[in-house]
Design a protein with these regions (language model features):
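C-terminal motif of bacterial Sec signal peptides marking the signal peptidase cleavage site
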Residues: 16-19
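Stable alpha-helical elements in mature extracytoplasmic
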Residues: 72-79, 117-122, 137-141, 191-198, ...
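Sec-exported extracytoplasmic/periplasmic mature domains
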Residues: 81-85, 126-134, 146-151, 163, ...
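Positively charged n-region of N-terminal signal peptides that target proteins for export
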Residues: 1-4
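Juxtacatalytic substrate-recognition/specificity segment
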Residues: 44-135, 151, 254-354
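Beta/coil-rich, acidic/histidine-enriched accessory regions frequently appended to metallopeptidases
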Residues: 22-34, 49-52, 58, 63-64, ...
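Zinc-dependent metallopeptidase catalytic helix centered on the HExxH motif
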Residues: 103-163, 324-434
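Active-site-proximal alpha-helical
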Residues: 163-224, 393-508
């Protein structure tokens, strides 16, 4: 009975929407035109164009055929007329488009003649003509309007997929599940079926206009209608992201001041992995913003004015970094994600003297986010250094010290590190303390990807022990200053923002040296063996 009702609803939707549409107007004469290059679609296109009411159809001159193009334009006009409430729309049918899939920018659509002939362009047409920008919403409504069918066993197919892909975010219907960059044909087909089913449910509950929103609030009800149960908080977070299209990237979304442009990487190989990492990163960013606003109220006025940043996911760079001058965050590894976002928020006017504070502040805000797996190699060495073939005597000694100090800090043995909520915090402190307590040992732990003397000496305060300085040592010193009341986090955040804030916290080199000497004395007293 439930299936019959759902089928009846789908039929009534298509019939009702079609009844409201208008017949396609007759073609007029084609005229010469041009699409000027712009930031969104950077291509100069000379065209043969025809206007049909609110619809403009533009063939690039290389794609125009005097016989075939009028027939294709008539097909587009018929599809457009099936869309009730369609606004003014321009469709560019071109050879060699900038993207393999149809691309939408506002009310403009760019695609190939083959995409029109096959119907592949229809979700993009729905998006451009009706202002429905969500990827799954456009896909689902397009299938509803143009005769797509949801299989009777959709719930079983979803259940089977989720059973085979533990932790999958398929039900978020994030754009990753609709693109060949991240998903195979079977996954895309299942996501499309889900999109149509959910779109029909939303229309039945609130009408077609509701599809212009995220529709996250309808997810629990839709799942219930299918007889499925799932934890929806994370799924709804992904649905609520401000997803957009970009000609150079398979997916794009904005959160706070950051525009993220995910691409396949070694840690985001498919839709499930990409959506999981994006969810983790966005959840961390939300926490970070709240922490900065709450704990650095004096600096927050500056922080919330941070200019927009682009976040790129890249594997062809040496290390993750934040380019403050060009406002670009480069992510080379998953563990660096929130750390680099913290840099973007807490560095306004870079100065070399404050370099170590940059790192300390960023790690203070984000080290809880680092997982056991992110620092797996260090946990493994701490626990098993005695059995590592080729390890030097100094390395065995240092990691033995790290193991001892880690237990003092955390209360658990190295073998139990995974039971801790934030295992990276005691690990990084233990590594730092062990290195500072035993500078005579010939060991260097790489907590940065390029720990060269040139980089260190040019970036960090010269009088600080720059040849030994790392992110971890900066972090541990900042933690000491905070825990012993020498500075508030607000003061440290201000010190990271610009030179004026740094000088307010550390007015002279002598004062800095005094603080650091006191830190080393405390370290020897508390953790010296």
């Amino acid at each position: 009975m439930k299936r019959f009702a759902a089928a009846l609803l789908a039929i009534s939707l298509v019939l009702g929407l079609s009844a409201c549409s208008s017949p396609a107007p007759e073609l007029q004469e084609f005229t010469d035109g041009v699409h000027e290059r712009d930031e969104v679609y950077p291509a100069h296109i000379e065209t043969k164009s025809v206007a049909l009411g609110g619809l403009g159809i533009h063939f690039s001159t290389s794609a125009f055929d005097e016989t075939a193009s009028p027939e294709l334009a008539q097909k587009v006009a018929e599809d457009y007329s099936a869309l009730s409430g369609a606004g003014e729309t321009d469709i560019y049918i071109i050879n060699g488009p900038l993207t393999d899939a149809p691309f939408v920018s506002g009310a403009e659509l760019f695609c190939t003649a083959e995409a029109v002939e096959s119907g592949e362009y229809r979700p993009a047409l729905v998006s451009a003509a009706l202002g429905i920008t969500g990827r799954w919403q456009a896909e689902g409504l397009s299938r509803e309007l143009f005769g797509g069918e949801v299989p009777d066993g959709l719930a079983d197919e979803i259940a089977a997929y989720l059973a085979a892909h533990e932790g999958s975010n398929l039900l978020s219907l994030a754009p990753f599940y609709f693109t060949e960059d991240f998903a195979d044909a079977e996954t895309i087909a299942l996501a499309s079926d889900c999109a149509q089913s959910l779109a029909a449910y939303v229309i039945g509950e609130a009408g077609q206009d509701a599809l212009r929103g995220s529709c996250a609030e309808y997810l629990p009800g839709w799942l219930k209608s299918l007889g499925l149960e799932a934890e929806t908080d994370g799924l709804q977070t992904l649905m609520e992201l401000d997803w957009t299209q970009n000609v150079y990237y398979p997916a794009e979304f904005t959160r706070s001041v950051f525009t993220f442009r995910p691409v396949p990487t070694e840690w985001m190989t498919d839709a499930d992995a990409a959506s999981a990492y994006v969810l983790r990163l966005c959840t961390g960013l939300d926490w970070l913003l709240d922490y900065l606003e709450t704990n650095a109220p004096e600096s927050w006025a500056r922080i919330e004015q941070t200019r927009p940043y682009e976040v790129r996911f890249e594997e062809n760079i040496d290390a993750s970094c934040t380019d403050v001058y060009s406002a670009v965050v480069h992510l080379r590894a998953p563990s660096a994600g929130l750390h680099e976002l913290a840099h973007a928020l807490t560095i306004d006017e870079p100065c070399g003297e404050a370099g170590w504070v940059f790192e300390g502040v960023a790690m203070h805000c984000t080290e809880w986010w680092i997982s056991y797996e992110d620092y797996g190699i260090f946990f493994d060495l701490m626990e098993n250094i005695d059995t590592v073939e080729g390890a030097s005597e100094d390395e065995r000694f240092i990691f033995g010290e790290i193991r001892r100090i880690f237990k003092e800090l955390s209360g658990v043995d190295a073998s139990e590190a995974q039971t801790l909520e934030s295992p990276a915090i005691p690990l990084v402190k233990a590594m730092t303390y062990a290195m500072l307590l035993h500078p005579e040992r010939d060991v260097f732990i790489k907590m940065v990807s390029k720990p060269t003397g040139d980089v260190m000496s040019s970036f960090y305060k010269p009088r600080y022990p720059s040849t030994e300085l790392s992110h971890a040592k900066s972090y541990a010193f900042c933690e000491y200053l905070l825990e012993h009341g020498y500075l508030t986090f607000d003061q440290l955040a201000a010190a990271s923002l610009d030179l004026e804030g740094y000088r307010a916290a550390f007015p002279t080199d002598e004062y800095f040296d005094e603080l650091y000497a006191g830190y080393l004395d405390w370290l020897r007293e508390e953790f010296g063996s």
